[in-house]
Amino acid sequence: MTTSSLVQGVFDGKKVTGIKTLFKVSTDKSGGQHFGSRLLWLPDGTLLMSVADGGNPPLRIGDRLAREQAQNPATHLGSILRLTDDGKPAPGNPLAAKGALPEIWSMGHRNIQGLARDPVSGRIWATEHGPYGGDELNLVVAGGNYGWPLQTYGADYQTHQPVGKHEVAGMINPSVAWVPSPAPSGLAVYSGDKIPAWRGSVFSGGLAAKDIRRVALDAAGQVTGQDRLAIGARVRDVKQGPDGYLYALTDEDNGKLLRIVAK
């Protein structure tokens, strides 16, 4: 049986020492799929930690399919957690008052691959792998339920039949649903000065699509358009550098760090 943990150590430029476990995800599981996680520090000093749903069918946890744990508030699986810097539940997590585990900040997630904060608006964005199709870009809010597996644009890997409905009352729709799947990865919100027309846009790396997706947003965070930047290699992460340029890290035998510039 396996699980995910949050650990802390000190990196001296060559190695990590003093490793200690700060937090362990509840509900051990079998299999080697869908652990998580992405980490994101917030301005208040708390940490967001994404945890995946536990795995694809036929994997089960108890008498339920593993993926159904994303709708179970008594487990951390399929959720984003908000923790203090010592691994404790952060105060004010809204679902605790409804009986959820106190660390849970949002739920109904399948397998988050990118997590980023817009430094201007403060909005939190996440990219998420769907099953067969139905990858998502979500605007994540505290207390939100993002539907998996009841609400999804994806299909079952084996049967290719829909897993859930496209819309379910009380659950939050994705800002973007990608069908077919680009297999999104790392995520960044651009606020630099090198390409002013891109300010405020979300950039998502693509593993299967071998590209970067730019999602343009208006001031309210609504999607106004999309562009595709062909890279020709699996893109594992996208980040804005301190110099204001956008960088992409490829996931290949001979991986590269690429700087994106305007033509």
Show the residue positions of the predicted features.
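Beta-propeller and closely related beta-sheet repeat lectin domains
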Residues: 35-38, 113-115, 185, 236
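WD40 beta-propeller blade-start loop/N-cap
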Residues: 24, 31, 107, 179, ...
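Asp-box/WD-like beta-propeller blade repeats and closely related beta-sheet repeat scaffolds
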Residues: 1-40
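Aromatic- and glycine-enriched pocket-lining scaffold segments that form the walls
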Residues: 35-54, 78-79
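Conserved blade-ending motifs and adjacent loop-strand segments that build the rim/top face
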Residues: 109, 221-242
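Blade-level signature of beta-propeller repeat domains, shared across WD40, Kelch, NHL, RCC1
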Residues: 237-263
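Short coil/turn segments that connect the beta-strands within blades of beta-propeller domains
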Residues: 44-45, 122, 199-200, 243-244
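Beta-propeller domain segments
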Residues: 3-5, 52-225, 255-256, 262-263
